[in-house]
Regions:
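Loop-helix junctions at membrane interfaces
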Residues: 1-170
Length: 170
């Protein structure tokens, strides 16, 4: 099997595995996001094994799959304006999941590089969800007694950190 074919097959397998794991939700947040059974791990390992370029490509495809899952979960039922919806798709799905491909950034540095790259990629994903919470989803904080409208940054950090920090740890 040629190297390109092997990369393609491995990429398809890790996307499928990550998708299956993303459906195993340990904690599901009320307005999106969840703690899953290591769903980012296959993408991260692929990036570390095959490099950032290939990792970003596979992570981008995974982001499209996650967007599809978001549609199934009711993304279009949240009443977003067209502009907010486009921003949500870009920030919460395309960019947030594509950055997982950066896990292989320090792969040549051995185990410490793998850990640093993985944490960096997941923290960047957390940052994208945090940014989305501040810019797009701030009005949903009113469901918490107005907390978010007064403290949008803190609300977004707490909400998104509640599911992303466990994902970093596991």
């Amino acid at each position: 099997m040629s190297q390109k074919t092997q990369l393609l097959v491995e990429g398809a397998v890790v996307i499928a595995l990550a998708t299956v794991l993303s459906f195993i939700r340990i904690i599901k947040m009320p307005w999106g996001g969840s703690v899953t059974l290591l769903s980012m791990l296959p993408i991260v390992i692929y990036s570390i094994k095959n490099g950032v370029k290939n990792g970003l490509l596979v992570a981008f495809v995974y982001s499209l799959v996650q967007f599809g899952q978001g549609v199934i979960d009711g993304l279009f039922g949240w009443g977003l304006t067209p502009g907010s919806l486009i921003a949500c798709i870009l920030i919460d799905y395309i960019i947030a999941f594509t950055v997982l491909g950066l896990a292989g950034l320090f792969r040549e540095k051995g185990l410490s590089g793998w850990i640093i790259g993985t944490v960096l990629a997941i923290v960047l994903r957390l940052f994208m969800h945090f940014l989305s919470g501040v810019v797009i989803w701030k009005s949903f904080g009113e469901l918490w007694g107005g907390f978010a409208t007064e403290n949008t940054v803190l609300y977004s950090l707490l909400y998104n950190g509640a599911y992303m920090v466990p994902e970093i740890i596991f």
